[in-house]
Amino acid sequence: MKNLNSGWTIEELCPQCGAPITLQEQDHIFSCNFCKVRLYIISSGFLRYYIPPPKELNEDIIYAPYWRFKGISFNYLKQGLKHRIMDTSLLATGHDLLPTSLGFRTQTQKLKFLSPELKGKFLKQKIPFNHIFSKIEQTKTRLSKKKESSSVFEQTFIGETTSLIYAPFYLKNYKFYDAVLNSPVPEKSKINMPKSVPLETIKRFNRSFLSTLCPHCGWDLYGEKESCILICRNCNSVWKASSSGFKKVKFEIFLIPKDNIIYVPFWKIQTNIADLNLQTYADLARIANIPKAANNNRDKEKLYFWAPAFKVAPNLFLRLSKQLTISPLMGKTTNEPEISEKYFFPATLPSTEAIESIKVTLSQIVINKKKICPILPNIKIDVQKYILCYLPFTIRANEIIQYHMRFSINKNALKIGKTL
């Protein structure tokens, strides 16, 4: 579960020319090597995949749904904040006749997007996605010597990849067989087969594509394959994908007239938290351990929480969020820059995920954690606005260094973050 390179390989056909394309789980953008089309993958909900059964297998296939979750989990405990990287799957049928998880199947088998052309029967999905975390924690508690879950005030999940995977099985002599392994599923009870198995007809195939052309000027949008934010270098605009098309994103850049600079994205979120009377930077200094020297002339500043707009390991995510929120970067920015020649690190964490991280950052900033953390579940976060800020970092051999504040980020940490 802690293998950071445990993503899937997905096989797809180019919707324009039909050529085969291979994707990784975290990819949002693909380019066809044949017709050169470049498309952004979107969905109106969870993406649905299936594991193809062996072609030589001559059986009536029954597909069983499994929830798949990959991301960072933050648990608020009496002892403090604990985090871990999760990579798990869970049977979504509501019965225990099949394996409870997919195990290593998604790493050893190539997946495909679920499509109307797929033949077979589908077991009904009964367990909603928001119920799987309680089941995961129950399993964790049974296996752990320390019964921590009873003291969890709240959980926050950041940077998650969530999908529904259909695994192939078949029935033979009143037993379920794993179609990939071509072997019977181990029995979990004396009752080997219920009188009936609930099936469903899949009607929603919620995957579609957007052309990566700027809606404003028609130029090619720039972004790496993992990017959730795309940049137009022609009209100097920034865009995010949605089910209804690309939408413009407000952004700022701290421009530096130097070479060897990479601009790294962070979300800057203006926030009011009425339950804690937090509206300004002075309010934050009141409940946080912020030195007076850092608070000079800032009493009336609006409160902004910061978060990386890219995926990184939880320790680094917390450090960057806390550091920029307590001592935000002060300097001249522009939202109408000439960005055609600038080097941008890809934004892989959407604004919705950054907003989810506000309580996590708050729990690390406040002095009286025993008082604040238990009430975090009931605290309402009122987001006024959010801005994508590109901060300049000087490129070094093994790290990048923030130009103004001089903190560093290891290049390997950024590389690993792209696989989360």
Short names for language-model regions:
Residues 2-16, 20-23, 27-420:
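Long C-terminal interaction/binding lobes of large macromolecular proteins
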